[in-house]
Amino acid sequence: MGSILSRRIAGVEDIDIQANSAYRYPPKSGNYFTSHFFMGGEKFDTPHPEGYLFGENMDLNFLGNRPVQFPYVTPAAHEPVKTLRSLVNIRKDSLRLVRYKDDSDSTPEDTGDPRVLYSVEFCFDTDARVAITLYCQAFEEFANGMAIYSAKSPSMVSETVHYKRGINQQFSLPSFKIDFTKWKPEELNFDLDKGVFPLVVQAIVDDGDDVTGHAHVLLAAFERHVDGSFSVKPLKQKQIVDRVSYLLQEIYGIENRNNQETKSTEDENSDNSSECVVCLSDLRDTLILPCRHLCLCNACADTLRYQANNCPICRLPFRALLQIRAVRKKTAATLSPVSFSPVLSQSSDHTEHSNADNIPPGYEPISLLEALNGVQPVSPSIPSAPLYEEIQFSGEMGDPLNLTGRQQNGDPGALKGKGSKSPDGSVRSPSSPIQEEEDEERLSELSDAQPQSVLPCSLSPSEDTVEGVTAKPGLPNSGSESRSLGVSVSEILQDCHSERSSLSQSESDPSADLALPASESWSTAVEEC
């Protein structure tokens, strides 16, 4: 305990390491972190002095430069936080190897197969002129805050290629090929003890003295597959700004939706929503550290601090919560949105829960999804589904089917269906309370109606119309067809003059048929009362 206090006062113990060598964790002596950290201009104490807040402690080996001496001068409270500008960025997902067959006739001694060579390709974005160089089996050193790489042999260093500013540029250098037959198996991966990186891609900004000390570094390793082929996998990325090295870490839960060409169509139905995983309403804007899951809104994150200390995604304990908020300048164009998006429209509601005091004047907060991908227009090829109230019957399908005797007698089973027609010609949801009230009113009206109005006692051979049902004589009839309609003749005539009529078919009695609008002609014989 006393040694820790003494280190806080006297400073960090000097480490026996060369000034230009890369720093490795854990140190031989002393501590890397202190008992507190600064974030957003505020000071926070941590119960884990040697815990890396943005990842695992072993990730510090990719940082390279030595830690800052402590204690150091803290910025004033009124001094604003300086925003770092990244002038160049290499898209690590686009890093790949391209196979080339050796043009020479030389083949390996052990096998007669032709030798296969590989070159490196990737995409990058830059806001300034940049010079890109590839290094294989390289060592890392630091001089005046800049990373300097040197390979084991000059043949493992590519020529420097210069590019102008632009986005989505393709790096391809077929003249620099890698022959893995000359590599040992242990040289394909990163060796922490030796400090040798299998592949280093260094992009140095070369656009005048104003941007001196800016660079982007991509560290990668190689993998050998069962079939003998090789692939490259990114390890870490570093951004050097004003001769200070920063380690880039991924944020899980936010991605560039515009760069989805490489993904299969099976991922189209995956969960790409940007709502909070707890409340499922507000947009997610809070990052959980050190797992780096962006899955909470500000309100749910504040509640989670006092209820639990585990991430809702990976269930690992978290040590800090970081709210990330994007802002943009208020312009006349932002007042009239080009299109409407249900997800992005929640940003206006989300701002009500956020603290507006930290927003600079003249700016407005926007969602991270909109800041990364912009406003996505709604596809016109997918029409919106109409509501129940918007569906109207045009009457072109024939005469409407009127109520049968079973419905007139108040059988509620005949009124049930997936969609019931309302008096105004619209279809409402079966579970709608309005539909239930209409059914009850209709049943009460039908129960009060006289049974004589259902069907007259005598049906003449001529055409008669009874409640919208046309009676036509002389058509063949079948009892099986009447059963298929779900309506029996006895139910129609059971209340005629309060007497029950028999259903015995008589050849002398005229028959009346009930015709329904359908693709086939259905008829039902009814004996005259």
UniProtKB/Swiss-Prot annotation:
Q: Where are the zinc fingers (RING-type)?
A: 275-314
Does the UniProt entry include the keyword Metal-binding? yes
EC number, UniProt record: 2.3.2.27
UniProt superkingdom? Eukaryota
Q: How is it modified after translation?
A: Autoubiquitinated in vitro.
- This chain's source organism reads Danio rerio (Zebrafish)
Molecular function GO labels: ubiquitin protein ligase activity; zinc ion binding
GO BP, sorted A to Z: endosome to lysosome transport; negative regulation of G protein-coupled receptor signaling pathway; negative regulation of smoothened signaling pathway; protein ubiquitination
- What job does the chain carry out? E3 ubiquitin-protein ligase. Also acts as a negative regulator of hedgehog signaling.
Question: What is the UniProt domain comment for this protein?
Answer: The RING finger is required for ubiquitin ligase activity.
| Descriptive protein name | Probable E3 ubiquitin-protein ligase MGRN1
Which pathway does the protein contribute to? Protein modification; protein ubiquitination
